[in-house]
UniProtKB/Swiss-Prot annotation:
Belongs to the purine/pyrimidine phosphoribosyltransferase family. One of its GO terms (molecular function) is adenine binding. GO terms for cellular component: cytoplasm. The keyword Transferase applies. It comes from Desulfitobacterium hafniense (strain Y51). It comes from the Bacteria. Pathway: Purine metabolism; AMP biosynthesis via salvage pathway; AMP from adenine: step 1/1. Homodimer. Its EC number is 2.4.2.7. This is Adenine phosphoribosyltransferase. PANTHER family: ADENINE PHOSPHORIBOSYLTRANSFERASE.
Length: 173
C-alpha cells in the first residue's frame, strides 16, 4: 500500500469539548478503509519490531487500533478498562488527573509475568493514561515492550512522562 498523508484524514474541531481545545477527531480516518488499513499497517510494522506477546489497548479508542494490530500480528489483545467494566478478578492502577483521579483495570489472569506487552492507543497527550497503563502492566510482572499512538500532541509533552519507554506516533501535532 502506498504511503499516505495521515494528517489529512484527521478532522480538527476547534473549541471542542470546551473553548481553547483543538480536538483531533479520528473518526474521519476510521471511516476511510484505505486510510484506516494503512494506519494500522504502519503501527503493526513498528510494533512488530518490539516482538510483543500481547497488545494492550486503553478504553475506548485504544480498542479501535489495538485489536486490529494484535490480529495482524497473530497475538492476543487485552483491553484496559475503567473500574467496574470487567466481570472477573482485576488488577488496578489509580492515577492523578488535573482535577481528581481515575483508575484503570485489567483481568488479573490476562497478562502473565515475563510477557512483553505493547501498548497501542489513539492519542498521546499528557501521558497520564499511558503512564498508568504501563504501571498496571508492570504490576502484573510483565514488561512494557513499547508504546504506539496514532496521534501525538507534542506541545503537551507526554513523552517526558514516558521516559525510559520506546514511544512511536504516526501523526505529530
Amino acid at each position: 500500500m502506498k504511503a499516505l498523508d495521515f494528517d489529512k484524514y484527521i478532522r480538527v474541531i476547534d473549541d471542542f469539548p470546551k473553548p481553547g481545545i483543538s480536538f483531533k477527531d479520528i473518526t474521519t480516518l476510521l471511516k476511510d478503509g484505505e486510510a484506516y488499513r494503512a494506519a494500522v499497517d504502519a503501527i503493526v510494522e513498528r510494533v512488530r519490531e518490539s516482538q510483543p506477546d500481547l497488545i494492550v489497548g486503553p478504553e475506548a479508542r485504544g480498542f479501535l487500533l489495538g485489536a486490529p494490530v494484535a490480529y495482524a500480528l497473530g497475538i492476543g489483545f487485552v483491553p484496559v478498562r475503567k473500574p467496574g467494566k470487567l466481570p472477573g478478578k482485576t488488577v488496578s492502577e489509580t492515577y492523578e488527573l488535573e482535577y481528581g483521579s481515575d483508575t484503570l483495570e485489567v483481568h488479573a489472569d490476562a497478562i502473565q509475568p515475563g510477557q512483553r506487552i505493547a501498548i497501542v492507543d489513539d492519542l498521546l497527550a499528557t501521558g497520564g493514561t499511558t503512564s498508568a497503563t504501563a504501571r498496571l502492566i508492570e504490576k502484573t510482572g510483565a514488561q512494557v515492550a513499547g508504546m504506539s499512538f496514532l496521534i501525538e500532541l507534542g506541545f503537551l509533552e507526554g513523552r517526558k512522562r514516558l521516559e525510559g519507554y520506546e514511544v512511536f506516533s504516526l501523526i505529530k501535532y
